[in-house]
């Protein structure tokens, strides 16, 4: 809304300057010292120019302004509508699996209380084994369905890129046809080609968001602060960027013919359908995998930590119940060193739901959380010719010398859901006693584990269920906010669409008796009045 109003006000200010300049020339026709203001292609600069053509330029520039604002708004609508569609899918998944950290975990703790704490059955326990298996199965199913959403986004990006490239090809061909068209011989027929190109540009804008630049005979389509995909008779098609190490990864780039390499340009497509898909993959889907991963390892580690130091009915020391995957380290392909980097969990209770970037500069490691782009200072020490540094419960180990500007990506939860595994085998006794004295066994560890359901395990401030519900609600709130915005912006498109202006087909006769200054004045007054009507209509509809 504010972007549209600001642009409209800027446009009206420019129109006001033109009108003031025209009035000055009318009131002081012999004053040669008046400063000339160049506004909208020097409208009142050349008095010898054909007045009809110049008046048409005023209308064309106004319509271009309206069209640009309409395209901006439409790109936002497509962006938000796409986000809503994807958020609803994610919201459905989170709602479907909301019982994992409530009912299923509660069933497990209740079974411990019933069989171990109260009934004192510190024996082979099929009931507890079944409850744990139910939790693992639910997590695996969550991972399966989350992967489906990730694959769906990847497929959608690839399919939309095919549409984008098809439109780029068509617009490129039409631009060449328009530039080569014999306008003087067939002055009215070129308008049909221009209208056809405009329709294709509208469609392309809804997919990737573009800016049209027209300057005399030049015609360009640019991405947001980026490359030109149409530059007169040149075109630049886009490509999908994938990864051999991560089948879920998808981005957008182009082939630089000079460097003969593929370059990533995801940041140049911040809005529209494609921008929304990329951002949803980059943010919401990544955040979901990280959040669920954080909850899982907090739960699994809390159980492991006491079961591994407990004793079973035979006095044997217990072991971990769950397998917890280690963080994944990805080295940048641009790194100049060949050092080996690995990562492992050191203190899981300190785990954060974020990925990290590690940057090596001037013999220092700079660690950035990607969730909020905050920088943290790791604790660094050298041991056995290895550089070890810790942050947020993770220990990274680097073997070998690093070079300046080396970059590493740390993904703590990329495999957490997939590799979660129940290590306890059927008919294997649980180790819930805190002593190996077979004559005086107890159930102390079971009592401690039973209390974990109400403990603040996540970020030292939330229970597992509280953290899950909070995250799920944040997705719902985001979706609801977008659903409220979209109808308003759709109405804005309608308002702008109805405010285009045209001039009489018989302009020569209609303006024959008006001098050049009067024509410009009347044209600009009409533009200003129309802009005022737009604002009034917005205020009346939404006040």
Curated annotation (Swiss-Prot):
Organism domain of life: Bacteria
GO molecular function: structural molecule activity
A GO biological-process term: bacterial-type flagellum assembly
Localisation: Secreted; Bacterial flagellum
Annotated Gene Ontology cellular component terms: bacterial-type flagellum hook; extracellular region
InterPro entries according to UniProt: FlgK, FlgK_D2-like, FlgK_helical
SUPFAM superfamilies in UniProt: Phase 1 flagellin
Keywords: Bacterial flagellum, Secreted
Family annotation (Pfam families): flgK_1st_1, FlgK_D1
Main location: secreted
Family indicated by similarity: Belongs to the flagella basal body rod proteins family.
Protein name: Flagellar hook-associated protein 1
Annotated organism of origin: Buchnera aphidicola subsp. Acyrthosiphon pisum (strain APS)
Gene: flgK
């Amino acid at each position: 809304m504010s972007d549209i109003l600001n642009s409209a006000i800027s446009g009206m200010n420019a129109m006001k300057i033109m009108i003031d300049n025209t009035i000055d020339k009318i009131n002081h026709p012999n004053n040669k010292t008046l400063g000339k203001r160049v506004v909208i292609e020097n409208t009142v600069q050349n008095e010898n120019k054909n007045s009809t053509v110049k008046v048409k330029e005023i209308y064309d520039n106004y319509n271009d302004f309206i069209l640009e604002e309409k395209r901006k708004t439409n790109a936002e609508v497509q962006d938000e509508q796409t986000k809503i569609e994807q958020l609803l899918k994610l919201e459905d998944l989170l709602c479907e699996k909301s019982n994992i950290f409530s009912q299923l975990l509660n069933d497990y703790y209740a079974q411990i209380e019933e069989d171990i704490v109260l009934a004192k059955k510190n024996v082979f326990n099929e009931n507890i084994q079944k409850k744990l298996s139910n939790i693992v199965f639910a997590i695996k199913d969550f991972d399966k369905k989350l992967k489906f959403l990730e694959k769906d986004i990847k497929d959608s990006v690839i399919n939309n890129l095919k549409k984008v490239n098809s439109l780029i090809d068509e617009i490129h061909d039409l631009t060449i046809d328009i530039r080569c068209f014999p306008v003087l011989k067939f002055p009215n027929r070129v308008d049909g080609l221009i209208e056809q190109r405009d329709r294709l540009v509208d469609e392309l804008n809804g997919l990737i968001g573009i800016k049209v630049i027209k300057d005399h005979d030049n015609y360009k389509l640019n991405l947001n602060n980026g490359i030109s995909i149409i530059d007169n008779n040149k075109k630049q098609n886009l490509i999908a960027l994938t990864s051999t190490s991560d089948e879920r990864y998808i981005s957008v780039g182009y082939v630089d013919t000079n460097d003969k390499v593929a370059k990533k340009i995801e940041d140049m497509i911040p809005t529209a359908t494609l921008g929304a898909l990329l951002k949803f993959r980059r943010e919401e889907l990544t955040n979901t995998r990280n959040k669920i991963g954080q909850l899982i390892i907090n739960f699994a580690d809390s159980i492991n930590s006491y079961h591994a130091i407990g004793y079973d009915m035979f006095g044997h020391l217990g072991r971990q119940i769950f397998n917890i995957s280690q963080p994944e380290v990805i080295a940048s392909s641009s790194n100049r060193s060949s050092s080996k980097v690995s990562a492992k969990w050191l203190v899981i209770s300190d785990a954060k739901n974020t990925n990290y970037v590690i940057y090596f500069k001037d013999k220092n490691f700079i660690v950035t959380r990607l969730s909020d782009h905050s920088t943290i200072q790791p604790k660094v020490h050298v041991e056995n010719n290895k550089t070890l540094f810790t942050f947020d419960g993770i220990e990274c180990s680097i073997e070998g010398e690093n070079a300046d500007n080396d970059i590493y990506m740390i993904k703590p939860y990329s495999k957490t859901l997939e590799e979660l595994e129940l290590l306890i085998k059927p008919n294997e006794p649980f180790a819930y006693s805190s002593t190996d004295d077979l004559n005086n066994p107890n159930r102390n560890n079971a009592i401690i584990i039973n209390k974990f359901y109400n403990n603040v395990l996540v970020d030292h401030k939330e229970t597992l269920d509280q953290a899950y519900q909070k995250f799920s609600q944040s997705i719902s709130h985001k979706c609801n906010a977008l659903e409220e915005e979209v109808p308003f912006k759709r109405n804005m498109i309608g308002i702008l669409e109805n405010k285009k202006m045209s001039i009489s087909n018989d302009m020569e006769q209609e303006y024959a008796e008006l001098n050049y200054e009067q024509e410009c004045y009347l044209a600009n007054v009409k533009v200003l009045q129309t802009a005022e009507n737009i604002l009034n209509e917005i205020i009346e509809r939404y006040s």
